[in-house]
Amino acid sequence: MSEYRQATDAFASNPVESKQEIRNYTMNFGPQHPAAHGVLRLILEMDGETVVRADPHIGLLHRGTEKLAESKPFNQSVPYMDRLDYVSMMCNEHAYVRAIESLMGIEAPERAQYIRTMFDEITRIKNHLMWVGSNALDLGAMAVMLYAFREREELMDVYEAVSGARMHAAYYRPGGVYRDLPDRMPKYKESRWHKGGALTKLNAAREGSMLDFLENFTDTFPSRVDEYETLLTENRIWKQRTVDVGIISPDLARAWGMTGPMLRGSGIEWDLRKKQPYAKYDAVDFDVPVGTNGDCYDRYLVRVAEMRESNRIIKQCVKWLKANPGPVMVTNFKVAPPSREGMKDDMEALIHHFKLFSEGYCVPAGETYCAVEAPKGEFGCYLMSDGANKPFRVHLRAPGFAHLSSMDAVVRGYLLADVVAMIGTYDLVFGEVDR
């Protein structure tokens, strides 16, 4: 008798003993998945299509930013901050330069504070435009990305006009900002894509200064947000994919240290711009949107409302900046570099500039923690100085790290398709998570 026949007879005589164990299966989500938003590797334990456990793996974008910052003079590490959350660049810079200013006991001029406030909100709109477009794309609504990037491109031009870079601006400096706002905006040149009446229309808002351009932008932007909401807010498929998906209770949000839209979407009104004002947030009028249910849909509504509030803040800052010219850097020349004009005919100014940017300056011994309300949540910088020209310790508090830690607790019991919606609503960028 063959071995096959023997095994068949054994199973027929006692099927209970031959019963095989049925186990959950493990699935790798990312790091190459297009909805992973970077290098997220999520190991999912699945029972059919239901998530039983989620294990996020991080570190694939670790670059040792904190240790790099500790090896360089204080003022040389500002560009590193841009490369953490590389969608919210200037907000990262703001936390770092505030920490240096706190240790040195200096304060940026009032005009520089208004410029920082304005660019923090420009950055918030840029972040949320990227988020609403990419999150909608993840869930199958491609058109929203095209609409959102139309306005985001205009704000990228503002970044480029003021700093020379579309993304990594390095515009904030300890003691102020790199330079005052430019008197003109760059214009589109004729090309195969821009020509004729369309080119004239595009350049119509770029005839004046940057503040004129931003004033025009703030007038038109609310109607653009209305267009995004027309596409999504009452869209039946969008609501089916987001309502009652990824519910985070207020207690769970507090327990996991959530901040920003993740916390406010659960109904907790916590915003550093209101609770611990910095820059000129105590001088502008705005509201803090909060959700009620704590699901993906509420977090979407919170971010859309935040874009409208950021637009209000920018409009107020533009009005003040137009009426109040002034310095944008402190007069403490231990921190402030000489002017470009001065360096052209003054050797002492050239030496001063060289020493300032090659050796930096010594910061009094001490420690401080400064945080800003970044688009994704509380971005904080703990800075310790031993009196040298380099930090003794730099620690960065990234909101995405705390949010990602809660992934397992939030996604359990949902379907695999819902995981994509939840990852999108977390608004993760792994430059800040891995650091």
UniProtKB/Swiss-Prot annotation:
Gene Ontology CC terms: plasma membrane
Bilayer topology term: Peripheral membrane protein
Catalytic activity: a quinone + NADH + 5 H(+)(in) = a quinol + NAD(+) + 4 H(+)(out)
InterPro entries assigned to the protein according to its UniProt record, in alphabetical order: NADH_Q_OxRdtase_suD (IPR001135), NADH_UbQ_OxRdtase_49kDa_CS (IPR014029), NDH1_su_D/H (IPR022885), NiFe-Hase_large (IPR029014)
Taxonomic superkingdom: Bacteria
Location in the cell: Cell inner membrane
Pfam family membership, one: Complex1_49kDa
Record EC number: 7.1.1.-
Entry-linked SUPFAM superfamilies: HydB/Nqo4-like
Alphabetized UniProt keyword annotations: Cell inner membrane, Cell membrane, Membrane, NAD, Quinone, Translocase, Transport, Ubiquinone
Subunit structure: NDH-1 is composed of 14 different subunits. Subunits NuoB, C, D, E, F, and G constitute the peripheral sector of the complex.
Task performed by this protein: NDH-1 shuttles electrons from NADH, via FMN and iron-sulfur (Fe-S) centers, to quinones in the respiratory chain. The immediate electron acceptor for the enzyme in this species is believed to be ubiquinone. Couples the redox reaction to proton translocation (for every two electrons transferred, four hydrogen ions are translocated across the cytoplasmic membrane), and thus conserves the redox energy in a proton gradient.
Family: Belongs to the complex I 49 kDa subunit family.
NCBIfam families referenced in this protein's UniProt entry, alphabetically: NuoD, PRK06075.1
Protein name according to UniProt: NADH-quinone oxidoreductase subunit D
Organism name: Xanthomonas campestris pv. campestris (strain ATCC 33913 / DSM 3586 / NCPPB 528 / LMG 568 / P 25)
Taxonomic lineage: Bacteria, Pseudomonadati, Pseudomonadota, Gammaproteobacteria, Lysobacterales
